[in-house]
Amino acid sequence: CLFEYENKVESKEVVHVLGLDYSQKHLYVDSEGQVCDYPHFYRASEKRLAREQRKLSKMVKGSNNYKKQRNKVAKLHAHVAQQRKDFLHKESRKIANSWDMVVVEDIDMKAMSQGLQLGKNLMDNGFGILRNYLKYKLEDGGKRFIKVDKWYASTQICNHCGAKRKIGLNERIYQCPKCGHIEDRDINAAKNIRDEGIRLHRG
């Protein structure tokens, strides 16, 4: 006799909500004002990777030495990737355990890398992977993961009064022309992302 079991995850009440803003200098900045710094695994291994890659390029393709060196380069890349995954799994688990709902922007990380020429920085950041890990960890626990539209002007809105102003890429502080509120631009953006997620959740 065969039995089918359906795993139903009970939805948790949404009380504690966190907004995450992508940061070029860090992994992310959150709506609580916390900054998550990211170990730069790729940059830490970049010189060694380049050195081993140069050795490989000088070898005769198909030779035993070439195959050995190719495997060595592949293992180095795999090691860096595994370091990144381990860190992001731990970080996403910590967030998923602490919050009922997490809100992020639905930004295209690959397009951003090409458009702003962030190549290596973005390769080392892992924010896109973190979002994926958060999504399934939260949803497996009956919690919410929400993406706000990529065109949502999170950096332009004053989280204090709702006024809107354009802000340059080099401006690190948001100063509202209407109410005078002053705040770190990334924290202000993370709070706006959080609030927009709450609005979307409530419908």
Predicted segments, located by residue:
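Positively charged, helix-rich recognition surfaces that bind polyanionic ligands
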Residues: 1-203
